[in-house]
Amino acid sequence: CWLRDAFFVVRALNSLSEVGTMEEYLRWLHDVVRDADGGHIQPLYGIGLEKALPERELAHLRGYRGMGPVRFGNQAHEHLQHDVYGHVVLGAAQSFHDRRLFRRADADDYARLEAVGERAW
């Protein structure tokens, strides 16, 4: 999952009133921030929060209209991309004010996001 899309995913799910799915995504985003090493956030993670995503070709899959190759992973997980911090903060902002959520963000969540912001600074 590319974190550069975090804000847009939250916005789209909110616009569709997909509150349950949005809350699950916000929980995933929360877990990314919680597990951030010293505030460092990768540009992308696996859906199960996997950090190492080496690119490899899946030869047994033909690809779209047989036009393969199909690849899994991306070496970008090794990169430092500063824009990702803003996308995470903007995406997570919904969890602080949306009263429809079962679990809204709290002071501990704010402190974790603050560390993310400091890392970007």
Regions from the PLM with identified roles:
Residues 1-121:
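Acidic, mature catalytic/reactive cores of soluble proteins
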